[in-house]
């Protein structure tokens, strides 16, 4: 065995010894990015509010981001990481480089073609995507312009996702996890520095997205160069690894991204509602993404390679133990996070977004959809854990069937809630219910296939969580006060009170958990 291969294996074994450590690194870097994202949303809300132009940007930006999560991150990662791991273990470093080059050429070629078509045909494509804007020519034209500006981001971020997948596979989790922070920095900078010079200030956000795509890709390349794995696109017709990745990707494209399809449907129907609906959904979704994007995604990133190795080693006991550990962490994090988002929805929105451009009505409307999204947080995070349980075993068909059921549930509920007049809150509720259905069916599938079983101690675990969350709810209820009182406070008073609620809530939650018997060994793996 070469020294290089020995170093790689040693790093992999070290990462394997502590899934919690790897998750913590990924989660902490992601948390930095999420806080910058929160700062970005505060800037956008305070500078642009919930205007027609803001609606146009959020919807235009959602299209390439949806495709990014569909192609570049979701299904691609599920297909690429297992094949790359196999090449690392069984083949030479040159073979790994050839695989990366071939994948870069194939993925880049497909995304480039899609981007060119969309940019040319944007006015036609925009008709169904922003159907609710068709009666407002100015808003529709702005959406088309923003779509053309933001769509090349898909190609840039797809290459960034490829680089990130390679880095994650080699145990270098921090760099890909911090990369999204550059998007937030670019958007904040564009809002302050570029917006004053444009005829429509919100266009600065679209240009900020494109600038961020370039920055994110350039940021990761030096780290790959150090590993001698810089992706130099090189077409390789019939490359065995690329063919296998495509085979795995096709069914995974739908299954792994059902939540994104649900959110896209929400935005489409929201465009039919009153002005501001798209923005209300956006801001509430962003706050819900704080716990989901920080902890849920971190778990998914770390768990997939671990489960893939367990399956390759035919170690069913360790496979199911890893899933059980991840599910316990989901409950540990998702339940209190959802509880806090529901109880503090309006104070949180007031503290972060309320000003002349984001009115009291905007706060009330966004709070409704935030609470609806929060109720599905456990389901959203559970999907992040359960889906890798199938993909690690190269079973892509079961998640697809389940995703189709969940999507049908979401579409049906969207229509029902829309007709019942629940507006944007109904759309958020439908997405949450569909996520819970998705998670429940994935769990049932894992149990039926014998790939997962609940370990001993779940009853005690749930009792501890019930006690801790009850204490947390009591603390928030007694200390938060009436939400309208927050409107009278200064910004510094709002921030201080929110910090006390968050810090005090975390302390109460942790103290009760420890008092109930939770120990480090219960969460460390």
Regions found by a protein language model. Name each.
Residues 2-525:
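Membrane-embedded alpha-helical bundles of multi-pass transporters/translocases
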């Amino acid at each position: 065995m070469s020294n290089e291969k020995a170093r790689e294996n040693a790093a992999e074994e070290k990462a394997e010894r502590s899934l919690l450590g790897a998750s913590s690194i990924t989660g902490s870097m992601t948390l930095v990015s999420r806080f910058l994202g929160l700062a970005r949303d505060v800037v956008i809300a305070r500078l642009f509010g919930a205007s027609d132009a803001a609606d146009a940007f959020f919807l235009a930006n959602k299209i390439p981001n949806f495709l990014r999560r569909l192609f570049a991150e979701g299904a691609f990662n599920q297909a690429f990481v297992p094949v790359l791991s196999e090449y690392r273990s069984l083949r030479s470093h040159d073979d790994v480089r050839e695989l990366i080059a071939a994948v870069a050429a194939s993925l880049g070629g497909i995304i480039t073609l899609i981007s060119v078509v969309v940019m040319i045909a944007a006015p036609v494509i925009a008709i169904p995507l922003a159907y609710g804007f068709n009666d407002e020519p100015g808003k529709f034209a702005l959406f088309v312009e923003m779509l053309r500006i933001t769509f090349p981001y898909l190609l840039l971020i797809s290459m960034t996702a490829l680089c990130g997948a390679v880095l994650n596979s080699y145990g270098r989790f921090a760099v890909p996890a911090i990369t999204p922070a550059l998007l937030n920095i670019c958007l904040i900078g564009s809002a302050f520095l570029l917006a004053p010079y444009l005829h429509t200030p919100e266009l600065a956000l679209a240009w900020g997205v494109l600038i961020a795509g370039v920055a994110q890709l350039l940021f990761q390349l030096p780290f790959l160069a150090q590993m001698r794995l810089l992706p130099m696109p090189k077409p390789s017709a019939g490359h065995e690894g690329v063919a296998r990745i495509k085979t795995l990707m096709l069914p995974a494209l739908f299954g792994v991204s059902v939540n994104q399809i649900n959110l896209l449907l929400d935005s489409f129907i929201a465009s039919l509602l009153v002005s501001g609906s798209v923005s209300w959904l956006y801001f509430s979704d962003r706050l819900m993404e704080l716990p989901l994007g920080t902890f849920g995604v971190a778990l998914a990133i770390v768990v997939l390679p671990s489960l893939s190795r367990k399956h390759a080693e035919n170690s069913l006991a360790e496979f199911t133990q890893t899933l059980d550990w991840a599910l316990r962490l989901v409950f540990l994090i998702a339940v209190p996070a959802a509880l806090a988002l529901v109880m503090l929805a309006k104070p949180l929105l007031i503290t972060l977004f309320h000003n002349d451009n984001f009115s009291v009505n905007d706060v009330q409307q966004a709070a409704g959809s935030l609470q609806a999204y929060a109720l599905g947080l456990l389901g959203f995070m559970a999907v992040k854990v359960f889906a890798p349980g199938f993909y690690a075993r190269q079973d892509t068909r079961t998640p697809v069937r389940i995703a189709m059921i969940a999507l049908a549930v979401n579409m049906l509920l969207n229509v029902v809630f829309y007709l019942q007049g629940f507006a944007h809150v109904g759309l958020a509720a439908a997405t949450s219910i569909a996520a819970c259905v998705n998670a429940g069916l994935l769990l049932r599938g894992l149990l039926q296939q014998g790939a997962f079983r609940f370990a001993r101690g779940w009853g005690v675990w749930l009792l501890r969580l019930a006690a801790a969350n009850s204490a947390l709810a009591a603390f928030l209820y007694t200390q938060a006060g009436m939400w309208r009182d927050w409107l009278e406070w200064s910004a510094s008073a709002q921030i201080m009170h929110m910090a006390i609620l968050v810090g005090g809530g975390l302390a109460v939650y942790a103290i009760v958990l420890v008092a109930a018997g939770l120990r480090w060994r219960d969460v460390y793996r």
